[in-house]
Amino acid sequence: MKSGIHPDYHEINVIMTDGTEYKTRSCYAQPGATLRLDIDPKSHPAWTGVQRMLDTGGQVAKFNKKFGGLGRRAKA
């Protein structure tokens, strides 16, 4: 392999939604950093069958503000 072209691959801590912690290797952030998950296999709708709205940073509100009127017809 060519040297100097690959990102640093190091160990990080991952915290799942139920508080479970484990270590894995990743290019994410700095060595020893913590990645806190918002959705994981224990809380994902595809596996649990439960829908929940998760608005991280107001993204859903921003989308609705921008595109909320699409599909509505003005009454004449």
Swiss-Prot record:
One of its GO terms (molecular function) is structural constituent of ribosome. Keywords: Ribonucleoprotein, Ribosomal protein, RNA-binding, rRNA-binding. GO terms for cellular component: ribonucleoprotein complex; ribosome. InterPro entries: Ribosomal_bL28/bL31-like_sf, Ribosomal_bL31, Ribosomal_bL31_A, Ribosomal_bL31_sf. One of its GO terms (biological process) is translation. It holds the Pfam family Ribosomal_L31. Belongs to the bacterial ribosomal protein bL31 family. Type A subfamily. Part of the 50S ribosomal subunit. NCBIfam families: L31, PRK00528.1. Binds the 23S rRNA. This is Large ribosomal subunit protein bL31. It comes from Gluconacetobacter diazotrophicus (strain ATCC 49037 / DSM 5601 / CCUG 37298 / CIP 103539 / LMG 7603 / PAl5).
